[in-house]
Structure formats: structure tokens, C-alpha cells
Amino acid sequence: MEKIRTLQGRVISNKMQKSAVVAIERFVKHIIYGKFIKRTTKLHIHDEKNECTVGDLIEIRESRPISKTKSWVLVRIIEKTVF
């Protein structure tokens, strides 16, 4: 059985119904210079209860394709943002 992939990221948009956009940051080493560069990947996630707000740190897991762009599901909110 395959291991289920989980990631952590920040919510950058939640204007859709039952969906959100999450920014996943990772560090990649430059091939020539060896410097570590921050790279960001944006993923669309499924948020069934519309729980997350912009700025929240969340955990997501990979799932079956839900729509054309969504194949990740919200697992839990790690850190809530207070405005």
C-alpha cells in the first residue's frame, strides 16, 4: 500500500465555495551556485465545511481528483490566524 502524501501550507485565498488555494513553500538548491532558493507552489484544495480563512497554516493530503484542478483535501488547521 502506498503512503499517503501530506503537506503543510498557508491559505492565500478562500473565495470559492468549499475550496481554497494554498501556497506550499520549499527550498531548492541552485544547480550552479549552490544557493538555496525559496520556491512556491499553489494548490487548490477541497474544504468541505469552509473552515479555513486566509493566513491559516493547514495540513492537506492527496486524494482522488475532485475536479479539474482539485486533488488535495484539508486534513486539519494547525494554526488559526487572528486579525
UniProtKB/Swiss-Prot annotation:
Belongs to the universal ribosomal protein uS17 family. Gene3D superfamilies: Nucleic acid-binding proteins. One of its GO terms (molecular function) is structural constituent of ribosome. Keywords: Ribonucleoprotein, Ribosomal protein, RNA-binding, rRNA-binding. Part of the 30S ribosomal subunit. HAMAP family: Ribosomal_uS17_B. It holds the Pfam family Ribosomal_S17. CDD domains: Ribosomal_uS17. This is Small ribosomal subunit protein uS17. One of its GO terms (biological process) is translation. It comes from the Bacteria. One of the primary rRNA binding proteins, it binds specifically to the 5'-end of 16S ribosomal RNA. GO terms for cellular component: cytosolic small ribosomal subunit.
